[in-house]
């Protein structure tokens, strides 16, 4: 099975490589790329801004606009409908779209979050101890939150009744406030997003607990660089350059975390730098540091693991079809294996 999956990915890589040579421009020109990030400007996004500040995008012939996002799931449809050329978005939202509208779905080209960050946060003294305890309770989340979108799959895997859980939507900036004020019993999100947003409100780690999806069989990839199929087909050189520049920015961020967070503060002066530095370190530790990177490198995927992720979502969410691994991710635009980070610390 693994060899079959790898063969499929290699075939797709060859197809994109052919496009890259046949579509190469006759003369150097600047390509504009609009990219939406996963959330408001925060510490873990420093690699994108370092790539910009150090001229890595420019060296690749790119002019990249990096906009704030409204959730990891929100970027995928924005790339699909042409509003953006690229996104830092959730692979699982991509799988769902590919299952429903394969012709519209974009494709992941560099997977950055290789450990599942999805969670429901509750107050430390909450009676909610297990997923079954969600029944009869109210959980809130932003409409495009990745954990909210995956909740039906979580219900099935963790064996509790989604129909007995009251779901309410809220503005992202009100999430932690509504939880601590008791307006909801739990909130959807990424562990570190909630944890550090709560810190900014003065909430200590000891005041929160997390019911993590990954503890109940949802071994999923998460955020990735996602591009439109149109861009990948018509300008593969630009996609490869985008990935190469971001990878260089990430390597620089790992070498100098302070500089990485400073690049974020340059765009959003109101951030609390010490908190955002801690947020970035925690993200590296818990969302980007899967043991597989020692072998395949950060940015790449294990095809068999990704296939299992696809199967989990298709089955649990009753999706109409099962996308192939090659529909979700292509390694065609990755830098050479020697240039991918194999160790984060």
Give a label for each model feature:
Residues 35, 66, 70, 109, ...:
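A residue-level marker of the well-folded mature domains of exported/periplasmic proteins
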Residues 112-122, 204-231, 243, 282-288:
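Periplasmic-binding protein-like
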Residues 28-181, 185-192, 211-213, 218-219:
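Short, glycine-/small- and polar/acidic-enriched structural segments
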Residues 233-316:
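Secondary-structure end/capping motifs
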Residues 55, 77, 81, 95, ...:
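Solvent-exposed, polar/charged alpha-helical surfaces in well-ordered, non-transmembrane soluble domains
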Residues 304-345:
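Conserved C-terminal helix/tail region of periplasmic/extracytoplasmic solute-binding proteins
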């Amino acid at each position: 099975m693994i060899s079959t999956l790898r063969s499929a990915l290699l075939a797709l890589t060859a197809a994109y490589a052919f496009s890259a040579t046949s579509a190469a421009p006759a003369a150097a020109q600047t390509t504009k790329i609009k990219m939406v990030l996963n959330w408001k400007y925060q510490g873990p996004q420093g690699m994108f801004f370092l790539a910009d500040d150090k001229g890595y995008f420019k060296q690749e012939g790119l002019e990249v606009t990096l906009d704030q996002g409204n959730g990891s799931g929100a970027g995928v449809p924005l790339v699909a409908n042409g509003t953006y050329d690229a996104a830092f978005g959730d692979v699982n939202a991509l799988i769902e779209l590919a299952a429903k509208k394969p012709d519209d779905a974009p494709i992941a080209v560099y997977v950055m979050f290789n450990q599942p960050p999805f969670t429901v946060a509750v107050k430390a003294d909450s009676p909610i101890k297990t997923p079954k305890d969600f029944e009869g309770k109210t959980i809130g989340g932003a409409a495009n939150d990745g954990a909210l979108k995956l909740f039906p799959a979580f219900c099935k895997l963790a064996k509790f009744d989604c129909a007995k859980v009251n779901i309410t939507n809220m503005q992202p900036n009100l999430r932690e406030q509504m939880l601590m004020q008791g307006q909801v019993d739990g909130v959807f999100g990424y562990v570190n997003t909630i944890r550090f947003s709560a810190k900014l409100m003065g909430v200590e780690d000891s005041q929160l607990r997390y019911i993590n999806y990954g503890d109940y069989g949802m071994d999923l990839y998460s955020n990735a660089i996602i591009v439109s199929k149109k861009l990948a087909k018509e300008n593969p050189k630009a996609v490869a350059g985008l990935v190469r520049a971001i990878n260089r920015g990430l390597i620089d961020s790992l070498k100098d975390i302070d500089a990485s967070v400073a690049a974020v503060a340059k765009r959003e002066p109101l951030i609390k730098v010490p908190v955002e530095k801690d947020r970035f370190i925690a993200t590296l530790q818990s969302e980007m540091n899967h043991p597989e990177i020692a072998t395949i490198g950060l940015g790449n995927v294990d095809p068999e693991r990704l296939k299992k992720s696809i199967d989990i979502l298709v089955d649990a969410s009753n999706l109409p079809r099962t996308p192939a691994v090659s529909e979700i991710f292509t390694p065609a635009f990755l830098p050479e294996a020697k240039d991918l980070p194999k160790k984060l610390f």
